[in-house]
């Protein structure tokens, strides 16, 4: 296919037009008084959102060169979202500001490579300043404040997330789902839960709720299928004498083995239940080992030369309470050794760092949470499906922001951390005038998010930026929600340092690539009216065959 090639100023101007189209659509959502964007869907109701990355993902431009610019900025939003989970609009605004200023300098005859080096120097310095000024999250009130800011000022969302984090710990899994009702509520599952239920409804001990509840329970972990209970008879007799209930977790319990367990349960001789082991393949082995460490038992594995005939009581795990429904099993208060559990968590964390697959990383993260804390589910409610989806976007953002705050600490919000970081560039010098111009570009661009937040609140951004530049107090800023100046930490206007850092890094990285672009290549659009495949343009002679 023939290609269309553009060079120099023409290429950069087309690209800048695409950047501006996307960034202008995204930046209206920034800040507590940011506006909504309505996105048309090919089926169903349109989607209403204030989530920057959701807006960016929907934008495709007709002109191929403009579209390339838009896609590059879309990449900024996506990368920031993947790494920090929030700050996508800030990243987009920063990228637009750096690209605009950078392309002006290139048009004025400056060397693009030196400009990029100057930009990189400035960004490194500002990031060091942001990380240096970050402070740890002190209490759940600050967690709630971070969540509230990220959820566009909705305090209830911030509170729900703070409650969930308090209950399951910083390592616990928090998932967000849509609720059928109007209320937004948080359910917490303590202990380890996995998605396998009882193998027979005859194991149920609470017929009203159709669940099996076993207190002070022994747990047998077997790696293979159980088809016959003959090898286990000595163990089962010992369990009956102990008077404790028994849960069997195996790859499967089938045929005669399951029938024997059910008959013994119904006769009242044995308090017992059986469930399949969670996961598949190697992940199943790993999860069985997790359960073993959590409950202080051993996995009966033929690879290790262990046979069911030789299993003794001290090889069984124990837990204070077990709840088994038809779909899931929850183990609460396992008798595992704390240092061993911590060592296992550290081992899985190491695997998370080394993993290259997002899916594997997510599954490993779930395993850490199940061992370390628990699982909380935030169920988002609303008056309509559109409202629920819009709120769910904001809850997701807020959740990611609070996690980021716990990891790297918090800084003043409202775009002020970037402006304060920019003050550290006062004495920074590059190797030549063009590098100094790159440093100046970053210094000016750092004010863009603050200006945009003010503009979206109906206030003059230049006036706000000027006041904050003049102040020596690093926490002094503009609260766009109440339109007053003061200590942003006291106002509860705070941002996670990780989100601010990631937004700036990703914006500068992509902006640097665009500034140093000299040529662009795209497919030429097909001429209108050309036959699609060349053959059989006229089917008129086949009319008589109808």
Swiss-Prot record:
SUPFAM superfamilies assigned: GroEL apical domain-like, GroEL equatorial domain-like, GroEL-intermediate domain like
Chief place where the protein resides: cytoplasm
Subcellular location: Cytoplasm
BP terms from Gene Ontology: protein refolding
Documented EC number(s): 5.6.1.7
Ranges in coiled-coil conformation: none
Chemical reaction(s) catalysed: ATP + H2O + a folded polypeptide = ADP + phosphate + an unfolded polypeptide
GO cellular component: cytoplasm
Binding-site residues for ATP, renumbered to this chain: 29-32, 50, 86-90, 414, 495
GO molecular function, one term: ATP binding
Pfam families: Cpn60_TCP1 (PF00118)
Domain of life according to the entry: Bacteria
UniProtKB keywords: ATP-binding, Chaperone, Cytoplasm, Isomerase, Nucleotide-binding
Biased composition, class Gly residues, residue ranges: 531-546
Region (Disordered): 526-546
Function field: Together with its co-chaperonin GroES, plays an essential role in assisting protein folding. The GroEL-GroES system forms a nano-cage that allows encapsulation of the non-native substrate proteins and provides a physical environment optimized to promote and accelerate protein folding.
Family: Belongs to the chaperonin (HSP60) family.
Subunit structure comment from the entry: Forms a cylinder of 14 subunits composed of two heptameric rings stacked back-to-back. Interacts with the co-chaperonin GroES.
The name this protein goes by in its record: Chaperonin GroEL
Organism encoding this protein: Jannaschia sp. (strain CCS1)
């Amino acid at each position: 296919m023939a290609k269309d090639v553009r060079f120099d100023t023409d290429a950069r101007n087309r690209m800048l037009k695409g950047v501006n189209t996307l960034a202008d659509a995204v930046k209206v959502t920034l800040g507590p008084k940011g506006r909504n964007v309505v996105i048309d869907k090919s089926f169903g109701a349109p989607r209403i959102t204030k989530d920057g990355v959701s807006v960016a993902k929907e934008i495709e431009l007709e002109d191929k060169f403009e579209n390339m610019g838009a896609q590059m900025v879309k990449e900024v939003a996506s990368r920031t979202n993947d790494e920090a989970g929030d700050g996508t609009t800030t990243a987009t605004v920063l990228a637009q500001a750096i690209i605009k200023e950078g392309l002006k300098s290139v048009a004025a005859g400056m060397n693009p490579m030196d400009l990029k080096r100057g930009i990189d120097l400035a960004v490194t310095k500002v990031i060091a300043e942001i990380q240096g000024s970050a402070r740890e999250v002190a209490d759940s009130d600050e967690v709630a404040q971070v969540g509230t800011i990220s959820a566009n000022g909705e305090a209830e969302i911030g509170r729900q997330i703070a409650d969930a984090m308090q209950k399951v710990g910083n390592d616990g899994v928090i998932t967000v789902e849509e609720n059928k009702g109007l209320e937004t509520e948080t359910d917490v599952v303590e202990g380890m839960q996995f998605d396998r239920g009882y193998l027979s409804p005859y194991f149920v001990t609470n017929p009203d709720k159709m669940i099996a509840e076993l207190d002070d329970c022994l747990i047998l972990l077997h790696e293979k299928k159980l088809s016959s209970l003959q090898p286990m008879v000595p163990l089962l007799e010992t369990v009956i004498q102990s008077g404790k209930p028994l849960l069997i977790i195996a790859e499967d319990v089938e045929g005669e083995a399951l029938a024997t367990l059910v008959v013994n349960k119904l006769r009242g001789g044995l308090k017992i239940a059986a469930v399949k082991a969670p996961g598949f393949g190697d992940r199943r082995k790993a999860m069985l080992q997790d359960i073993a460490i959590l409950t202080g038992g051993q996995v009966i594995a033929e690879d290790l030369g262990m046979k069911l005939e030789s299993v003794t009581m001290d090889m069984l795990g124990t837990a204070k309470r077990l709840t088994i429904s038809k779909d899931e099993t929850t183990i609460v208060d396992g008798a595992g050794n704390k240092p061993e559990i911590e060592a296992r968590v550290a081992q899985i964390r190491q695997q998370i760092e080394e993993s290259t697959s997002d899916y594997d990383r997510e599954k490993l993260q779930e395993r850490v949470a199940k061992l370390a804390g628990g699982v909380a589910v935030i169920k988002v409610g609303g008056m309509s499906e559109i409202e629920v989806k819009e709120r769910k976007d904001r809850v997701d953002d807020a959740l990611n922001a609070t996690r980021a705050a716990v990891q790297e600490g918090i800084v003043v919000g409202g775009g002020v951390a970037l402006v304060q970081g920019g003050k550290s560039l006062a004495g920074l010098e590059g190797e030549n005038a063009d590098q100094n111009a790159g440093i100046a570009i970053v210094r000016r661009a750092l004010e863009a998010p603050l200006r945009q937040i003010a503009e979206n609140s109906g206030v003059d951004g230049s006036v706000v930026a000027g006041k904050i530049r003049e102040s020596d107090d690093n926490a002094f800023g503009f609260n766009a929600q109440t339109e007053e100046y003061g200590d942003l930490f006291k106002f509860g206007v705070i941002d996670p340092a990780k989100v601010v850092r990631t937004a700036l890094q990703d914006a500068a990285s992509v902006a640097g690539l665009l500034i140093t672009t000299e040529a662009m290549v795209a497919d030429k659009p097909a001429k209108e009216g050309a036959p699609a495949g060349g053959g059989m343009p006229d089917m008129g002679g086949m009319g008589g065959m109808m």
